[in-house]
């Protein structure tokens, strides 16, 4: 699935991932391929991309590899929203 992460200043990530874990208002939730369409608010926390590797170095510099979990890259947000539909998601955050 394709995920794009945008802040007011720049595009933090755009590419294919296996799944994404998000800090929802009611707790962390996981989006996988073929997930039902969703629009949700996000609270302060970490967006976790599950993917083999972040190939683009311009994007990779914004992420930390999570040592306890293979293929997991995190980006800290203060809040935002996600729209996911047809295996494509846009995360607007700050």
Task: Annotate each PLM feature.
Residues 2-94:
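Compact, glycine-rich, soluble single-domain proteins
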């Amino acid at each position: 699935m394709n995920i794009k992460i945008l802040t007011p200043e720049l595009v933090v990530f755009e590419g294919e991932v296996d799944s994404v874990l998000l800090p929802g208002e009611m707790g962390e939730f996981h989006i996988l391929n073929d997930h039902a369409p969703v629009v949700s608010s996000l609270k302060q926390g970490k967006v976790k991309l599950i993917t083999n590797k972040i190939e683009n170095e311009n994007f990779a510099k914004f992420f930390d590899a999570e040592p306890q979990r293979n293929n997991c890259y995190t980006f800290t947000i203060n809040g935002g929203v996600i729209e996911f539909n047809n295996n494509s998601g846009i995360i607007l955050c700050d």
